[in-house]
Each structure stands twice: as C-alpha cells, then as structure tokens.
C-alpha cells in the first residue's frame, strides 16, 4: 500500500525542509505538500533524492480559480509552470481546486459574484484544456472537493460536484481526489459514494471526524472503508495522511503504519 505523509499537517514542529528526512526516518516512502511556488524546488529535489522519497502530489493552482472566467489566462499560465515543476520533482499528480488555495492553504477568492452556470462552464472549459496537457505530459489531475467547514465559500463541496464535471471532460488523466474527512462532513454515505465513483477516484486523503486526526480517533469506520477501497474496488493509488495527531506523534505514527 502506498502511504503518503502531508508535511503541512505532520512534523510541523520542524522547519519545512527538515520534515523530509523525518518522513523517511519514520518509515514512509511518499510525501506531499500544497503549493510549490513559495519553496525552493531545487532543495526539495535534493531532499527527495537524499531520502529516497517520492513526491505524491502538490497543488497545480495557487492564485487563480478554476471556476472564474476572469482567471482563465493566468490559471493556464500557472498550471503550465506547475507541470514543469512536476517533471522536475518527478511528481505524477497535480491537485486542482475549484477555488485556488495559495500559501498556507488560504483560499484566494470565493467567486460568490458568479452564478453556478458560469462556474460549471468555466471549470469544464479549463479542465478540458489542461487535461490535454496532462495527457501529453503523462500527469494526472486530482480534482479535490473540500468542505465549507474548512474553506467557507469553496465551490466544489461534494463528490458529485466534481465527479459530474470530471465525467463530462472524459479524460483518463482527470481524477477525483476523495478526501474522506471532507466528504464525511459534507455528505456522509461514504461507501456508496466510493462505489459510485470508483472509476474516477485517483487519490485518497485520510483524516477522522471530528478534528482531522488519525484513523480510529473518530466516527469513521476506516477498516471497512479500506476493505471497500482495496479489496472490493481494487484501488491501488496513494493513501495520504493529511491529519494532525490527537495525542502524541508516536501514537499517530503507530496508527498510520498499521493502517
């Protein structure tokens, strides 16, 4: 099983670049973070190589929204830079948000001045365009719905709000990033939703409810979800721990390794 550590949630007592060797030291092979643009990607590349780590994903957007017609030109330009960064860092997955998340995960704009028809049309247009680039470059776009509890004003807040557009785009390189924590908050019915979208799910984010802590600390039946994903649906992608420890880091690490 491929397990990734989100270093913007874990090992946060350490400086950013010191978290990479800690991921390897604690026995994990994959690492991920949000925006690449505020970091030294040459240093990150060296740290990945020195610690024999694979970069699972990072955000392909930052300051420009997928859903806003006024952002289309800048969105595409930044995405192309993200593609270059992905190749440099040997990363196969770029996360795409309806509302771009900038430094420290801050949502840039909510787009509340736009109607739903405009947002859907713009998101579809932009995804069609960047999907062609992703296919040509051998990359995967992981479209992530996010809860309004975490990002008030975010547009794609349910699995269907992203899945419907992904299916219209129809590219094998455009997938659904299913964040179990966010989707439990927004819609529940996790197993049926996973089964319904098994053909397009490309990446899993893990965190329990409430609090976004390690599996087993909240209300979600993670052993059963894992069984459904792996044994029933044959999911072989990355399970990423985007969470913070409920008690101690040692206890959290033990739980993540046992997952």
Q: Can you name each region flagged by the protein language model?
A:
Residues 29-30, 54, 92, 140:
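Residue-level detector of anion-binding/catalytic polar loops
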Residues 37-47:
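Active-site-adjacent beta->alpha loops and helix N-cap segments on the catalytic face
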């Amino acid at each position: 099983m491929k397990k990734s550590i989100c270093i913007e949630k874990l090992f946060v007592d350490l400086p950013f670049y010191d978290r990479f060797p800690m991921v390897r030291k604690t026995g994990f092979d994959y690492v991920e973070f949000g925006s690449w643009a505020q970091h030294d990607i040459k240093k990150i590349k060296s740290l990945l190589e020195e610690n024999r780590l694979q970069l699972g994903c990072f955000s392909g957007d930052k300051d420009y929204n997928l859903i806003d017609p006024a952002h289309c030109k800048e969105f595409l330009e930044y995405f192309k830079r993200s593609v270059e960064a992905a190749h440099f860092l040997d990363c196969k997955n770029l996360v795409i948000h309806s509302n771009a998340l900038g430094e420290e995960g801050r949502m840039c704009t909510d787009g509340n001045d736009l109607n739903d028809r405009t947002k859907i049309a713009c998101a579809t247009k932009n995804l069609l365009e960047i999907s062609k680039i992703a296919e040509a470059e051998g990359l995967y776009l992981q479209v992530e719905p996010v809860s309004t509890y975490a990002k008030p004003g975010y547009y794609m807040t349910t699995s269907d709000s992203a899945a419907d557009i992904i299916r219209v785009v129809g590219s094998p390189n455009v997938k659904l990033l299913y964040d179990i924590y966010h989707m439990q908050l927004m819609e529940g019915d996790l197993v049926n939703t996973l089964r319904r979208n098994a053909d397009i799910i490309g990446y899993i984010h893990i965190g329990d409810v409430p609090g976004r802590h390690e599996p087993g600390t909240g209300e979600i039946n993670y052993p059963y979800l894992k069984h459904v994903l792996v044994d029933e649906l044959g999911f072989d992608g990355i399970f990423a721990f985007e969470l913070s420890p409920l008690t101690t880091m040692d206890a959290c690490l033990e739980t993540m390794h046992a997952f």
